[in-house]
Amino acid sequence: MGDFNDTPSDKSIIHGIKTMSYPSDTTSAHSLYNLFSNSEQLAKPGSHKYQGEWAQLDQIIVTGTLLDSRNPMHLIPGSNRLFTPQFLFKTDKTYHGTRPFRTYYGYKYEGGYSDHLPLLVDFSLPLAP
């Protein structure tokens, strides 16, 4: 999980890490699945904005085991999303629209959070006995 500095469709993600698309019709316990591979539908506007362009540079990659609902701990289908509350954004005076409310904008301290938006995913966990 984290900032890969590449989009889900980049060769480094697909061929380098060998990720599969999610959701997938079939899953294998030994394969890796990028929960943000279908970012056009999942992650609007994207997790990072650079020179006016949003891109999904942050990924959560899991094994097929976490996609199997028969396992005690598993991903809740459809729970992968960007966290986009209004307080994480600031007006983008240069490129218009909004941008993440960053801690620093160049050398200027803004007091924000990050230049990337957070990713969220929900897991089902077994109850303790």
Model-predicted segments: where are they?
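Active-site flanking residues adjacent to catalytic metal/cofactor-binding acidic residues
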Residues: 1-3
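Metal-dependent phosphoester-hydrolase catalytic domains
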Residues: 5-129
